[in-house]
Amino acid sequence: MANKLKVDELRLKLAERGLSTTGVKAVLVERLEEAIAEDTKKEESKSKRKRNSSNDTYESNKLIAIGEFRGMIVKELREEAIKRGLDTTGTKKDLLERLCNDANNVSNAPVKSSNGTDEAEDDNNGFEEEKKEEKIVTATKKGAAVLDQWIPDEIKSQYHVLQRGDDVYDAILNQTNVRDNNNKFFVLQVLESDSKKTYMVYTRWGRVGVKGQSKLDGPYDSWDRAIEIFTNKFNDKTKNYWSDRKEFIPHPKSYTWLEMDYGKEENDSPVNNDIPSSSSEVKPEQSKLDTRVAKFISLICNVSMMAQHMMEIGYNANKLPLGKISKSTISKGYEVLKRISEVIDRYDRTRLEELSGEFYTVIPHDFGFKKMSQFVIDTPQKLKQKIEMVEALGEIELATKLLSVDPGLQDDPLYYHYQQLNCGLTPVGNDSEEFSMVANYMENTHAKTHSGYTVEIAQLFRASRAVEADRFQQFSSSKNRMLLWHGSRLTNWAGILSQGLRIAPPEAPVTGYMFGKGVYFADMFSKSANYCYANTGANDGVLLLCEVALGDMNELLYSDYNADNLPPGKLSTKGVGKTAPNPSEAQTLEDGVVVPLGKPVERSCSKGMLLYNEYIVYNVEQIKMRYVIQVKFNYKH
């Protein structure tokens, strides 16, 4: 029943159906139940039509199947038995009897290449295939790689993806070409029987977001033949040799290989989208953690939430599972965006189309059957959105590695995940001076221009990262240390708390950062709160209050992408805004840290482009987390 699902589960189910995910739980339940009822009605109607027609064809199909079996030689009968998951021992008579009985039970013709069409015909941009509801399917993992979710169950039960040494014969290929309206995938796997006696080659292809067509070649008696077919197909589709894939070179109108992170080989296990189980399945009160901490960990370590957030911003987690994202894929995403940033001001439409296609090839998106021309990355705003997406994927890549041990194997998964963060969280009581100071700072610095929502503190924690305390020591008595806000997507917090705030990598485009690549802070709460990207349907947010050693600041009125090249003697950049907390109302803590919690006042000089101040440091050693604030957004409209 829909009402038994949790809110994040309801949103995920609705997103899978392409329905709105906004609203309170009661609204979500009603929306999902209506959709389920409509689906049931359609299925009943379809089944009724099928029954009326299938009764006439059942016997004829069965006779055709049995007739084909009788014309096969022993080797062909054995191959057919393997495909059906049947015993392959015995004489021709035994095999024939076994297959005929199976035909009587399921009434299907001999299993040949699924859908019967060779992939050379390609996907025709996917327009001839109806887009069906794609559900999250439980995939089967044996060893390093996950068997494709659409491989027949009888094959899954007996086969695994072949691995020889460091070579895992599993490839996901992607090709997006904006001008030709292509957004397609190609899956390629060598399957080895669990008995290691037979081998098959599985392929599936189509437009991103649909099941597509598939083909199963074999079985073969040795892996040599299967590997030959696999490597030839890989070369045919990508114009690269499988043996040289680590130095992969993309070619126009060819597929690109998406590198997967296989990690260490694990025991056979079913996995959901090949990402770790969600901690939200465990009730916080069942953990030995303080209930407040346990609730927070269940929020930020919720993989369903991560998948949902990424789906909402267009990422296709079914094509490149969140748990298998490699660092090289993220780097490639940044590299393409960097090249886009270099031509975006010239507005070279043809080049922007080419580069947008290259980005969507590396970072798969599900656009359904919309025209690809709608999704060209041709404005600074669109570029910024994609940079933020890749940043989020980078944080998720860290988080999924952090949570990679199946919490089901742990007595207390929430406690296990908390330990993995290596960040101490101490709850702060609502009646404490600290809580009052933070609440005051938050309330006073909520800008008038951000009046579409109010925010309340759900939980407040003192944060302690040992590594930060040690490296910050050199700045602990320096002048101009301030307590400043930093907000980020909910998907990012497992990575941030475990690794600290980090600076964008060299391959990221500098144009995505107004004052160069650094860590950005604000003295206005709502400016940072906007970077939580909460909404009416997902109104949880998390922010940091950090002690930041600013030293002498390089004050700028206008953006400067090269501001990270600080003038001699300067330790940080301040983007000067038109409105800022009243400095005369600031509070200084016992250790000398300044808290700019005064009510906003306007600057006498109106020059500049920023509404509010921004503070940027380019050395993470100048940052020390002080508080983690979990908040609830209450939207007025």
Curated annotation (Swiss-Prot):
Per the database record, which ranges form the PARP alpha-helical domain? 286-404
Q: Where is the composition biased (Polar residues)?
A: 106-117
The primary gene name is PARP2
Catalytic function, reaction form: NAD(+) + (ADP-D-ribosyl)n-acceptor = nicotinamide + (ADP-D-ribosyl)n+1-acceptor + H(+); L-aspartyl-[protein] + NAD(+) = 4-O-(ADP-D-ribosyl)-L-aspartyl-[protein] + nicotinamide; L-glutamyl-[protein] + NAD(+) = 5-O-(ADP-D-ribosyl)-L-glutamyl-[protein] + nicotinamide
Stretch list, region Disordered:
35-56, 106-134
| PROSITE patterns noted in UniProt | PARP_ALPHA_HD, PARP_CATALYTIC, SAP, WGR
Q: Which organism is it from?
A: Arabidopsis thaliana (Mouse-ear cress)
Q: What is this protein called?
A: Poly [ADP-ribose] polymerase 2
State the superkingdom: Eukaryota
Question: From which residue to which does the signal peptide run?
Answer: none
Q: Where is the composition biased (Acidic residues)?
A: 118-127
